[in-house]
Amino acid sequence: MALTPADVSRIANLARLELSTAEQSDLLVQLNGFFGIVERMRAVDTTGVAPLYTPLSAVQDVSLRLRDDAVTETDQREANQKSAPAVEGGLFLVPRVIE
């Protein structure tokens, strides 16, 4: 799929870009190069290849490295609320700011 100069002008217009003729021709070369790479990737036969979420999983077993969901700190609510001006039911009370 090769783009034409008219395609680049239309894309620039949709993106609200003002490009000079030189910029349009440079962009045309870059975009056609990009689409060339995409076409080469599409041409590769991937039948029977399992999708990877990381290339590393092709060469070694990658498991999710998550820590155990365990409590690591003690409850210090009362100690934290000692310096608060107003507390009720374990919650900080703040002045009403909207009437």
UniProtKB/Swiss-Prot annotation:
Q: Which residues form a coiled coil?
A: none
Enzyme kind, highest EC tier = ligase
Looking up InterPro entries in the UniProt record yields: Asp/Glu-ADT_sf_sub_c (IPR036113), GatC (IPR003837)
Tell me where the transmembrane regions lie.
Answer: none
Q: List the disulfide bonds.
A: none
Q: Which Pfam families match?
A: GatC (PF02686)
Write the Enzyme Commission number(s) for this entry: 6.3.5.-
Keywords linked to the UniProt accession: ATP-binding, Ligase, Nucleotide-binding, Protein biosynthesis
Citing just one GO molecular function, the answer is:
glutaminyl-tRNA synthase (glutamine-hydrolyzing) activity
Catalysed reactions listed for this entry: L-glutamyl-tRNA(Gln) + L-glutamine + ATP + H2O = L-glutaminyl-tRNA(Gln) + L-glutamate + ADP + phosphate + H(+); L-aspartyl-tRNA(Asn) + L-glutamine + ATP + H2O = L-asparaginyl-tRNA(Asn) + L-glutamate + ADP + phosphate + 2 H(+)
GO BP, one annotated term: translation
Protein family per UniProt: Belongs to the GatC family.
Fetch the PANTHER family from UniProt: GLUTAMYL-TRNA(GLN) AMIDOTRANSFERASE SUBUNIT C, MITOCHONDRIAL
Q: What does this protein do?
A: Allows the formation of correctly charged Asn-tRNA(Asn) or Gln-tRNA(Gln) through the transamidation of misacylated Asp-tRNA(Asn) or Glu-tRNA(Gln) in organisms which lack either or both of asparaginyl-tRNA or glutaminyl-tRNA synthetases. The reaction takes place in the presence of glutamine and ATP through an activated phospho-Asp-tRNA(Asn) or phospho-Glu-tRNA(Gln).
- Self-association or partners: how does it assemble? Heterotrimer of A, B and C subunits.
**NCBIfam families, per database record:** gatC
This chain's protein is named Aspartyl/glutamyl-tRNA(Asn/Gln) amidotransferase subunit C
| Species | Leptothrix cholodnii (strain ATCC 51168 / LMG 8142 / SP-6)
